[in-house]
Amino acid sequence: MDLKGKTLFITGASRGIGLAIAKRAAADGANIVIAAKTAESDPRLPGTIYSAAEEVRAAGGQALPLQVDIRDEQAVLAAVAQAVMTFGGIDILVNNASAISLTDTEHTPMKRYDLMNGINARGTYLCTQACLPELKKAAAAGRNAHVLTMSPPLSMKTHWFAPHTAYTMAKYGMSMCTLGHAGEFRKYGIAVNSLWPRTAIATAALQMIPGVDVAACRKPEILADAAYLVLTSDARDAANTGNFHIDDELLAAHGQADLDRYAVTPGNRKFIPDFFVD
């Protein structure tokens, strides 16, 4: 099973992990809806919906760049309608867009709290709700419908909350969407899963966090390859929904034990661990 001719609606796909997932799918000849906010280049965060579209086309896919703020319900509904008008439907939703602030309660103003929850938890829920009618059609037509959310396994351990309670709440909100929607959408034949990296991933956003050694990170392509495995699995198989995958575990389970090619620094074995993975 591959992604040729499938349409993927990917949020936050103008750069980083979202773009890597888009390009991996494009290599099969997929249609990619690039739903992201950045339409003009910013030297601090290179990449726009238009530059991403060029990369997707160069990789072998079709691209529809759409400027979308996933906090805006009407903007999301309009983007879904445009995707359907352009490609005839939506087979896969990838909830990748996310906001982060690693601040404690005293240093997290409500504006920042609302931003994280608006993008992470609410945005994931909204995009899933908006795409659901098309995903149901795709599943009914045997097109292997999937929802994949880039969020961590749920853990109630205090050390994952205390340093950045607001961020954890927002990120776990995405994971709770996976938990609930996997059960809710099972009857439609739509698989719903989460995927999370074991290590820090070298993205432009990560490099803006002070003190991060990018040389001790892995590349976004490890998540792209792991996502591909999820999205090409049989959505109607009960074992393939409701999972909280860790990238290297999933790859190893599919026989990909040598992960050195994903290291920013080849040969490195000491990576920065990501949040929420014990």
What are these regions (language model features)?
Residues 136-187, 196-201, 212:
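Catalytic loop of short-chain dehydrogenase/reductase
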Residues 104-105, 109-114:
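Substrate-binding pocket helix/loop in short-chain dehydrogenase/reductase
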Residues 47, 67-79, 110:
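The beta1-alpha1 cofactor-binding region of Rossmann-like NAD(H)/NADP(H)-dependent oxidoreductases
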Residues 128-129, 179:
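A short, exposed helix-loop element centered on a Lys and neighboring polar residues
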Residues 14-15:
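Conserved glycine-rich cofactor-binding loop
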Residues 28-51:
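Conserved glycine-rich Rossmann-like NAD(P)H-binding loop of the short-chain dehydrogenase/reductase
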Residues 194-195, 211-278:
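C-terminal helical subdomain
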